[in-house]
């Protein structure tokens, strides 16, 4: 099955929540459920938006508490930060996150070990829309649709200038091409796996 996921990142500052409901409405129009990675500060500032995402059927996962560089933190500092983020998110959703996208996409062995010690999995992406650079909708569409492949995780941001304009075209194009959009939890492997440099998982028996 040709599946991929839309991975939206939310930040407290400078990103706001102005287009959160617009994104929810667009995804609903295409009957799409996906995953939002939320910073704890943003969840604290916009609890109604966190609840709206959850109530619309989307996964709301962690993107840290303050968007610090995890590579520079100790194991305990990482655990404390993720715990605080999870508490802020679950206060609005009633569900404790099981996935996290590390700030800046940075991670190393000690970051991964700290996160997995909490029973969580770190998530990367393999297609970056670069919507945060305020490219026009056509450029964003071309970038995403030319790079998506089965199993892709596509990175978008809330409060990016042209994402609400680009997203319907991207969804229409990829759905018409036979793709199904699913939350990240439906893409990740539970069995032993390896991860390549793009963050894509492969069954361990296919390693090498």
Model-derived features: positions:
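Catalytic domains of cell-wall/extracellular-matrix polysaccharide-remodeling enzymes
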Residues: 22, 44-45, 65-203
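Active-site beta->alpha N-cap acidic-glycine motif
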Residues: 1-73, 77, 81-91, 95, ...
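Short, solvent-exposed mixed-charge patches
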Residues: 206-208
């Amino acid at each position: 099955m040709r599946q991929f996921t839309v991975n939206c990142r939310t930040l407290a500052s400078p990103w706001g929540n102005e287009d959160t409901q617009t994104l929810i409405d667009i995804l609903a129009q295409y009957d799409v459920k996906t995953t939002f990675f939320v910073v704890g500060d943003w969840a604290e500032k916009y609890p109604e938006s966190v609840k709206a995402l959850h109530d619309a059927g989307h996964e709301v996962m962690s993107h840290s508490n303050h968007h610090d560089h995890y590579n520079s933190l100790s194991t305990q500092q990482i655990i404390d930060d993720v715990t605080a983020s999870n508490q802020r998110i679950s206060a609005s959703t009633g569900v404790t996150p099981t996935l996290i996208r590390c700030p800046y996409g940075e991670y190393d062995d000690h970051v991964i070990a700290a996160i997995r010690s909490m029973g969580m999995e770190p998530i990367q992406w393999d297609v970056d829309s670069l919507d945060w650079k305020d490219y026009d909708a056509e450029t964003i569409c071309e970038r995403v649709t030319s790079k998506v492949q089965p199993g892709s995780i596509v990175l978008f941001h809330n409060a990016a200038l042209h994402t609400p304009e680009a997203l319907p075209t991207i969804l229409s194009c990829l759905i018409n091409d036979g793709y199904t959009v699913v939350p990240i939890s439906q893409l990740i492997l539970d069995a032993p796996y390896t991860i390549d440099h793009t963050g894509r998982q492969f069954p361990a028996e296919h390693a090498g």
